[in-house]
């Protein structure tokens, strides 16, 4: 992708970059990156679309790797794959939840929180209803995923200050423990298996999207579990919680004992479950009831019904003398009747007898009481218990919905969370399993329609280039179960069997078995097996038993039982759980009662319609084993789930499709702010149609055409990274607008502050004088008439500022120094300089040092390399109170000897050189008035305690002596003549303009660059010039030399002066004063500037010519300098051109081929560089290839600013045509004035060179010279400035250069250095 990702977002490291071999070279290769200890190491790939091979086995291998590394989540595009770890991994903490707030899925590892964040973000951003479909077999972790999504949305969407919204949030979260207790149970495959379906819909307010209501839809509770379970399974959790930890008042009221007492909780021989704390869960259930708002009376009624179910289950039967069923223990029946508030005799009759009514047309028939046998009586007893629990559960759901209804505020936006039973295959599968698996087939059909089929159909409809993918459509299986015509399905056959033989269940089962042959006659997904049948589901083949299916499909209580509960004196039973209309519906012969298959079919279709109206998210859960043990991974079982879930097809679809699509209108509505052509100040300004606006937006955002396609009505974005980048730019638009307003305000405040400070400073100076200049005058007075002065020291603008390194600042280079060496005092003076050190058996050396002065001490700090790392160390600490005298010479040098009263090997006398020596002397004298200042032609100090050494100073005129420095050799310092000792600083020059330069408030970066280029002021803390330091006078770039042979070359004439159109008008904008563009210097001035940069004074290095840089040959040097440094807004007075020079410089030779550092390759194709660590390639561009590793090459741009890996097949070796450089131009011939200037001993490079090239021909012949020298000088100054301002990293390199370049003061050792 060719655009920048969302700001502050880290790229997921999904691919390994080819490792760079540790070859030789000084660079040492790519350094190892810092490891983030908070981020786990990536194992496998986090998105299956990144797999190199798309097979079921490859998907399984990747999931296995991640599972064993406790990484259970993996993506397929936007689909989340979750593998149940069967243990707590600690990944659902509040701290981890906060990491996903406001983050897109590529910034953070795959997680269910990322899916929840995406849903909530899309709800707010696009106003679309959201839903998440969680699918997988039983025990794969669907319920846990639903709980965590609810937890996340409740946390990120709720305003804690709003009591009503916080209450809704708490109630939504409380539904989890409540419905788990009443609707989940332990099965062979899952300790917390959902035995019902649940669709939770959270409704949000308009505008701020706070949860204001919720609604739960229940689907098909498995009520058969109340009365019977398979061995090693359990009843619903609430029965074990209630019987184990029942409150004392309920024990007395309802006679509750342990779970082993009751048949319904002990028959399966599984009372306790590892990892399940029934006591804690029961407290959570009670707390949830209180949060939801159940009154104490309602809670009593709930537990009363649970107790009645348990005691009904304990009713047992014996045969009487006629073989009919009789109650074994009347006390049990009596206690159950007490709990139901009915007559015990009526309860007994309803269980062991059946009432049959006959009718003859319109005449009333007879009523018979038919006794039941033990099997029939047991079925009636169980039907009563199942009916009570089923209706109780449905009432709890309705009661919860009443509490969750919240305010009456209208809301049209919602997030739905579907937690429904997973696909089931048992040894014996009956009606419950066919209903459960039917619902899962419908969910699979939704997944196919919404992800696979709909995606391909949309591409065809929108005329998008697309490669069709084959997939299995399970609609044929859904029709096999639910269809009514033309071929009736299983549910229709069940209903018809009940209608044919409604009185006899066994007869109805036989009728159903006969009709199966017609149901699946032409369906290859169905097989009839005599009393059983097989359906080939998407998840596997399942064998179902016919026996008992018709009876379970009736889903209606017997009339005797309804009449029983209608006689109850408890209004909760006869009005709430069993309202009177139930009995009326049962006796109405005009309408067939609704069967269980009708209910589940109707609910499933409503669910499909609801989900189809939402933007779906998908979580596909996988169960890794059947043992429910952590770190147990069954490859065959997981591979089977991968196949029936269709993960491979999903990956193939994702790899070939588009991640995002939107209508043109909606896309423009969302992103028109990103283009200046479509949006201005938040308003839509485009006048064209929507598709042209889309093109303009994508063009302005630099989205390459390969990242999107335009259909007939929609725009398709290929990768999610592109969408995230667009969203990020949109988010930043408003931040940028806010930042613009903030900048304007801060600019206004800064102008006021600066103006106030200017007035305050001016008043202080007028009233009390300038303290820095006063201290300067004090320091100069100490040396007045005794020592020659440097010209830079006598500038009127010179002031003694003290802390030149900024040690007293809160941050920066100076603060870095004192923190490193541990100086805790306030710094009075700080500067860089040199010290003369004598090593054992070697000559004295001038070494760079840092000098810091506090109230008590002088700290001399050395920069040393320890294991290739820069360290600052205190070399000497000199107490100011112990200083005896300061020794200086009478000349203009910068040497100072600090002599102590009692020097020691650790605190010796020092001989130092620094530009601010006068200020240092003044500071020390002020701190210790008893210090003596000795000034003479020699300086004496003790190199070692008791060993005095004398340094002699002389006036020299050799070429090795710099104008503004000195030359040290064998104890003698040679220096040029300075200003007279009686020199004084002139008054500070007045500003050239009284107006404030407001440009610095609007474009500070440009103002600095312009100021630096146009008017440079002396910087006193710069290192001593090269010659002054005694270093080799090798220039930073080669001085142009006269070529021996060259070919004349025609060059286009170029004038170094700006044209009239290039000079900005002063009146264009009166509110701002733009910096006047400085014209390029004349060729002769550039040569002079180059020479000045190599060894001349700092002042000469920073001279910038004015509009007309040509000076008169007879004009004094000082006049020329003043002219070139003037930057007033007034026009420069024109001067007469100098007479033409007879001899001109020859033109430059043709370009010569420079051999490249590395082999050069040309890019044959574009490469986007989307892989981490890679570099993008642009077709037909030439690059360096420094290393080849297999199919990858280490590529570097020609300017060596970027480096990374790219496919070597994208490159082709080529000749280095792009590396040609022109030969340096020849220097101009020296004029006669240079010789006379040199004879006088004072050269002025500006005045002597500006008179040589004044004619048009000189400008023409040196046009190439102008650009070459200008670029070289600019590069040299830029490199030098960068070297001076860099901290630790650059200091290390600078120190190595200095140590390598430092030379001995003499080839022979000094005579004093041989003392042992």
UniProtKB/Swiss-Prot annotation:
Q: Which parts of the sequence belong to the TH1 domain?
A: 789-981
Where mainly found? cytoplasm
Renumbered to this chain, region (Disordered) spans 1-29, 964-1154, 1209-1316
Report which superkingdom the organism of origin falls in.
Answer: Eukaryota
Entry keywords, A to Z: Actin-binding, ATP-binding, Cytoplasm, Cytoskeleton, Hydrolase, Motor protein, Myosin, Nucleotide-binding, Phosphoprotein, Repeat, SH3 domain
What are its GO biological-process terms?
Answer: actin cortical patch assembly; actin cortical patch localization; actin cytoskeleton organization; actin filament organization; bipolar cellular bud site selection; cell growth mode switching, budding to filamentous; cellular response to starvation; endocytosis
Query: Biased composition, Low complexity: where in the chain?
Result: 1042-1065, 1117-1129, 1233-1268
**Which residue ranges have biased composition labelled Polar residues?**
971-984, 1018-1030, 1097-1106
For bias type Acidic residues, the affected ranges are 1305-1316
Q: Where in the cell is it found?
A: Cytoplasm, Cytoskeleton, Actin patch
User: Compositional bias (Basic residues) spans?
Assistant: 1-12
Q: Which Pfam families match?
A: Myo1_CA (PF22773), Myosin_head (PF00063), Myosin_TH1 (PF06017)
* Comp. bias regions, Pro residues: 1137-1153, 1223-1232
Q: Would you tell me the protein name for this molecule? A: Myosin-5
Q: What species was this sequence derived from?
A: Candida albicans (strain SC5314 / ATCC MYA-2876) (Yeast)
Gene name of the encoded protein = MYO5
């Amino acid at each position: 992708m060719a655009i920048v990702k969302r700001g502050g977002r880290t790229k997921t490291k999904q691919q390994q970059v080819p490792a760079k071999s540790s070859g030789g070279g000084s660079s040492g290769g790519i350094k190892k990156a810092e490891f983030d200890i908070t981020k786990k190491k990536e194992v496998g790939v986090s998105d299956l679309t990144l797999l190199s091979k798309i097979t079921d086995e490859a998907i399984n291998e990747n999931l296995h790797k991640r599972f064993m590394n406790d990484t259970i989540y993996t993506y397929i595009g936007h689909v989340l794959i979750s593998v149940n770890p069967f243990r707590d991994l600690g990944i659902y903490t509040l701290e981890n939840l906060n990491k996903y707030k406001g983050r897109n899925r590529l910034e953070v590892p795959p997680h269910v929180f990322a899916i929840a964040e995406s849903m909530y973000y899309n709800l707010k951003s696009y106003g679309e209803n959201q839903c998440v479909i969680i699918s997988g077999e039983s025990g794969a972790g669907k319920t846990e995923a639903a709980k965590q999504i609810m937890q996340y949305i409740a946390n990120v969407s709720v305003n804690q200050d709003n009591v009503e919204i916080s209450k809704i949030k708490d109630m939504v979260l409380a539904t989890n423990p409540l419905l788990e207790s009443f609707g989940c149970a332990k099965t062979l495959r899952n300790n917390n298996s959902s035995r019902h379906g649940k669709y939770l819909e959270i409704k949000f307010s308009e505008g701020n999207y706070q949860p204001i209501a919720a609604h739960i839809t229940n689907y098909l509770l498995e009520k058969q579990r109340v009365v019977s379970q398979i061995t090693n399974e359990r009843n619903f959790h609430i029965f074990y919680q209630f019987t184990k930890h029942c409150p004392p008042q309920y024990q007395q009221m309802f006679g509750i004992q342990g779970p082993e007492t009751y048949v319904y909780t002990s028959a399966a021989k599984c009372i306790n479950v590892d990892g399940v704390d029934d006591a804690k869960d029961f407290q959570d259930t009670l707390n949830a009831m209180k949060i939801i708002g159940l009154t104490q009376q309602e809670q009593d009624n709930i537990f009363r019904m649970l107790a009645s179910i348990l005691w009904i289950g304990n009713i047992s039967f014996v045969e009487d003398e006629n073989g009919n069923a009789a109650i074994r223990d009347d006390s049990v029946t009596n206690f159950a009747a007490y709990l139901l508030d009915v007559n015990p005799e009526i309860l007994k009759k309803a269980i062991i007898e059946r009432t049959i009514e006959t009718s003859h047309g319109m005449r009333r028939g007879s009523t018979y009481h038919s006794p039941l046998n033990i099997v029939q009586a047991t079925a009636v007893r169980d039907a009563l218990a199942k009916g009570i629990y089923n209706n109780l559960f449905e009432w709890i759901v309705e009661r919860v919905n009443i509490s969750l209804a919240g305010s009456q505020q209208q809301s049209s936006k919602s997030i739905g969370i579907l937690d429904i039973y997973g696909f089931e295959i048992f040894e014996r599968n009956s009606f419950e399993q066919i209903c459960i698996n039917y619902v899962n087939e419908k969910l699979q059909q939704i997944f196919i329609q919404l992800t696979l089929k709909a995606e391909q159909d949309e591409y065809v409809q929108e005329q998008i280039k697309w490669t069709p993918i084959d997939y299995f459509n399970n609609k044929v299986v859904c029709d096999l179960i639910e269809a009514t015509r033309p071929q009736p399905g299983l549910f229709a056959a069940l209903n018809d069997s009940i209608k044919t033989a409604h009185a006899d269940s066994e007869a109805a089962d036989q009728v159903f078995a006969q009709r199966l042959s017609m149901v699946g006659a032409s369906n290859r997904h169905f097989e009839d097996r005599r009393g059983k049948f097989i359906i080939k589901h998407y998840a596997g083949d399942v064998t179902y038993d016919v026996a008992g299916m018709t009876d379970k499909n009736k889903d209606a209580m017997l009339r005797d039982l309804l009449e029983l509960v209608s006689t109850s004196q408890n209004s909760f039973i006869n009005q709430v759980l069993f309202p009177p209309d139930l009995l009326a519906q049962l006796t109405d012969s005009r309408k067939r009662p609704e069967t269980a298959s009708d209910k589940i079919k109707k609910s499933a279709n409503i669910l499909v319609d609801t989900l189809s109206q939402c933007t779906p998210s998908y979580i596909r859960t996988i169960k890794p084993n059947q043992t429910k043990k952590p770190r147990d991974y069954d490859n065959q079982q997981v591979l089977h789930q991968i196949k029936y879930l269709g993960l491979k097809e999903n990956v193939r679809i994702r790899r070939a499709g588009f991640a995002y699509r939107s209508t043109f209108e909606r896309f423009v509505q969302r992103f028109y702010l990103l283009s200046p052509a479509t949006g201005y100040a938040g308003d839509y300004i485009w006048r064209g149609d929507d598709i042209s606006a889309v093109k303009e937006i994508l063009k302005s955002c630099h989205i390459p055409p390969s990242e999107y396609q335009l259909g007939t009505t929609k725009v398709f974005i290929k990768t999610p990274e592109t969408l995230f980048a667009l969203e990020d730019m949109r988010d930043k638009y408003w931040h940028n607008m806010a930042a613009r307003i903030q900048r304007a305000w801060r600019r206004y405040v800064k102008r006021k502050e600066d103006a106030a400070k200017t007035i305050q400073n001016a008043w202080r100076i007028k009233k009390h004088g300038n303290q820095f200049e006063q201290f300067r005058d004090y320091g100069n007075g100490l040396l007045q008439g005794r020592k020659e002065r440097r010209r830079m020291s006598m500038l009127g603008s010179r002031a003694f500022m003290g802390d030149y390194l900024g040690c007293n600042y809160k941050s920066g280079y100076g603060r870095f120094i004192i923190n490193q060496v541990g100086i805790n005092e306030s710094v009075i003076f700080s500067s860089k300089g040199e010290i003369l050190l004598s090593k054992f058996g070697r000559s004295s050396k001038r070494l760079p040092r840092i000098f810091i002065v506090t109230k008590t001490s002088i700290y001399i700090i050395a920069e040393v390399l320890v294991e290739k790392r820069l360290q600052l160390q205190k070399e000497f600490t000199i107490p100011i109170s112990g200083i005896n005298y300061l020794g200086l010479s009478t000349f203009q040098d910068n040497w100072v000897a600090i002599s102590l009263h009692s020097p020691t090997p650790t605190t010796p006398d020092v001989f130092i050189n620094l530009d601010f020596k006068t200020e240092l002397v003044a500071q020390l004298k002020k701190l210790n008035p008893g210090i003596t200042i000795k000034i003479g032609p020699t300086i004496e100090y003790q190199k070692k305690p008791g060993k005095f050494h004398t340094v002699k100073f002389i006036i020299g005129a050799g070429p090795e002596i710099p104008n503004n420095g000195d030359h040290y050799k064998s104890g003698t310092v040679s220096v040029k003549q300075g200003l007279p000792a009686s020199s004084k600083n002139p008054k500070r020059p007045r500003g050239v303009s009284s107006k404030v330069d407001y440009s610095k408030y609007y474009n500070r970066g440009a103002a600095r660059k312009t100021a630096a280029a146009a008017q440079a002021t002396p910087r006193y803390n710069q290192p001593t010039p090269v010659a002054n330091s005694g270093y080799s006078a090798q220039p930073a770039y080669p001085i142009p030399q006269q070529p021996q042979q060259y070919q004349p070359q025609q060059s286009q004439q170029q004038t170094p002066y700006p044209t009239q159109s290039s000079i900005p008008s002063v009146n264009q904008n009166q509110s701002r004063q733009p910096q006047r563009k400085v014209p390029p210097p004349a060729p002769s001035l550039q040569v002079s500037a180059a020479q000045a940069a190599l060894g001349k004074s700092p002042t000469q290095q920073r001279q910038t010519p004015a509009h007309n840089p040509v000076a008169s040959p007879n004009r004094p040097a000082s006049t020329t300098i003043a002219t070139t440094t003037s930057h007033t807004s007034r026009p420069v007075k024109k001067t007469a051109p100098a007479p033409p020079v007879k001899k001109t410089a020859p033109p430059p030779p043709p370009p010569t081929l420079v051999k490249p550092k590395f082999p050069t390759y040309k890019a044959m194709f574009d490469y986007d560089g989307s892989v981490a660590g890679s570099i993008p390639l642009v077709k037909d561009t030439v690059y360096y290839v420094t290393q080849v590793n297999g199919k990858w090459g280490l590529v570097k741009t020609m300017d060596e600013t970027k480096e990374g890996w790219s496919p070597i097949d994208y490159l082709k070796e080529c000749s280095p045509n792009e590396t040609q450089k022109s030969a340096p131009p020849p220097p101009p011939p020296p004029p006669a004035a240079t010789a006379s200037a040199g004879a006088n001993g004072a050269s002025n490079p500006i005045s002597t060179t500006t008179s040589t090239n004044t004619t048009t021909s000189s400008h023409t012949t040196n046009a190439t010279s102008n650009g070459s020298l200008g670029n070289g000088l600019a590069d040299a100054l830029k490199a030098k400035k960068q070297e001076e301002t860099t901290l630790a990293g650059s200091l290390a390199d600078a120190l190595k250069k200095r140590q390598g370049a430092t030379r001995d003061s003499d080839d022979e050792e000094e005579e004093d250095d041989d003392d042992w």
